[in-house]
Amino acid sequence: MKSASLIIISILTITGCCPVFFQPANPGVDYRWAIERWQQKVQAEGWGEPLIDEITSSCLRLAKYEQEHGDDNWKTYHEFLKDFKGDCEDISVFMYGTLKRLGYPKALRLRIIRMPMGDHAVLMVELPKGEWKMFNSTSMPLDFADIAVSRTIVEWDDDNIYYPR
């Protein structure tokens, strides 16, 4: 029986099908490494839309979307870093906190939009040239038809709350 187990383990290891190869990376380790790399890029190249896109898309890859049931409790940036799990507002806060941690010099806002599918949180970033860009907090693309009929409920930053007129 021992020899059969050894043969199976050997085959799995040789073929690359060993479960150890499928273990997900620790998002905390990946995140710390990414922060260091982004800091180097900011120092070398400065801020630009491609770097902001890279940072936000990397945050989405590190985050695991988990729909909350019952009361909707928002995680802080530091709470999110404990397990990298949350729903749309937690992931938006994570992206916001990441850009703040990196010293992003332009305005950042969290925005709640009302859409046909329900309320949704996104990150708004003032780009280096002054225009605003919305970053979705889930990997599922927003339908343009839904965006067209959506409306902002509220948005805010560290200092102010903005209501639509």
Which stretches of residues belong to each language-model region?
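A structural boundary/capping signal
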Residues: 16-165
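Sec-dependent N-terminal signal peptides
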Residues: 4-14
